[in-house]
Swiss-Prot record:
Its main location: cytoplasm. It is found in: Cytoplasm. This is Endoribonuclease YbeY. Zn(2+) binds at H116, H120, H126. The gene is ybeY. It comes from Paenarthrobacter aurescens (strain TC1). One of its GO terms (cellular component) is cytoplasm. Signal peptide: none annotated. One of its GO terms (biological process) is rRNA processing. Its cofactor is Zn(2+). PANTHER family: ENDORIBONUCLEASE YBEY, CHLOROPLASTIC. It is an enzyme of class 3 (hydrolase). The lineage of its organism: Bacteria, Bacillati, Actinomycetota, Actinomycetes, Micrococcales. Keywords: Cytoplasm, Endonuclease, Hydrolase, Metal-binding, Nuclease, Ribosome biogenesis, rRNA processing, Zinc. Belongs to the endoribonuclease YbeY family. Its EC number is 3.1.-.-.
Length: 157
């Protein structure tokens, strides 16, 4: 399993915990152990640039996901095939503001955004109410199990 974190944000983040969480999610969703994931931590100007390039929307956002091999969650009988899951870009500065507004630690917000990004890479979405219920329910379940406590509430921009 190749999970890389590249911190270009200038903010100190517990990168090891992001990797541990990602491995946990891979195991729980039966993602192939050799699947690859890249997590890029960027500052607000870099995130705004990515947001414009990828979504044609101005302003920095919290997390962006760029899927590669269209992998989906597997099962115990049929794990996800080996491949490149994709890239997640997270802006710790935006995460810090969202965490403060929600009343939980910034690192919990970083874990929430990492989980959210991975689920997007696996094909989950929240454009429709039913999709949102499924995605956010799984997100809370995974994060609660990982943290051993209630997951932080979503802080959508």
């Amino acid at each position: 399993m190749s999970i890389e974190v590249n911190n270009e944000s200038g903010v100190v983040v517990d990168e090891a915990q992001l990797v541990t969480l990602s491995r946990f999610i891979f195991e729980r969703l039966y993602i192939h152990p050799q699947a690859e994931l890249s997590i890029l931590l960027v500052d607000e100007p870099a995130m705004e640039k990515l947001h414009i390039e990828l979504m044609d929307e101005p302003g920095a956002t919290d997390v962006l996901s760029v899927p590669m091999d269209e992998l989906t969650p597997g099962t115990p009988e049929k794990p996800t095939p080996q491949g490149m899951l994709g890239d997640i870009a997270i802006c710790p500065q935006v995460a810090e503001v969202q965490a403060r507004n929600a009343g939980h630690p910034t690192q919990d917000e970083m874990l929430l955004l990492t989980t959210h990004g991975i689920l997007h890479l696996l094909g989950f979405d929240h454009a429709e109410p039913e999709e949102k219920e499924e995605m956010f329910g799984l997100q809370r379940e995974l994060l609660s199990e990982f943290l051993g406590k209630d997951a932080p509430m979503e802080t959508m921009q």
